Design a protein with these regions (language model features):
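Positively charged, polyanion-binding regions of nucleic-acid-associated proteins
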Residues: 1-23, 51
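Short acidic, hydrophobic short linear motifs in intrinsically disordered regions
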Residues: 21-34
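Conserved tryptophan-centered aromatic signature that marks the ligand-binding surface of SH3
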Residues: 21-24, 42, 62
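Basic amphipathic alpha-helical segments that dock to polyanions
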Residues: 27, 48-56
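A short, conserved structural fragment
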Residues: 54-64
Length: 72
């Protein structure tokens, strides 16, 4: 499970860094597309990983647009 969490984290960070702003549905679609050759991530686990990255200060939620933003 630890390896899966690290893979999910890396895709979230790579995607948010590349796009700067991203909606939740699009982020889920990209994560599943990137990881489908390894495993299909559980949506609850993805939500947990996003919340963890928010707590660590890597990404944040824009209150107006409800999109995730990369924090450089």
């Amino acid at each position: 499970d630890y390896d899966k969490d690290m893979l999910i984290d890396s895709v979230i960070m790579k995607t948010s860094k590349k796009l700067k702003n991203i909606s939740y549905p699009r982020l889920i679609m990209i994560i599943r597309g990137e990881l489908k050759t390894y495993f299909i991530p559980n949506e609850n686990n993805v939500k947990h990983r996003i919340n963890r990255l928010i707590q660590l200060g890597y990404i944040k939620i824009n209150d107006e647009s409800k999109m995730y933003e990369y924090i450089p």
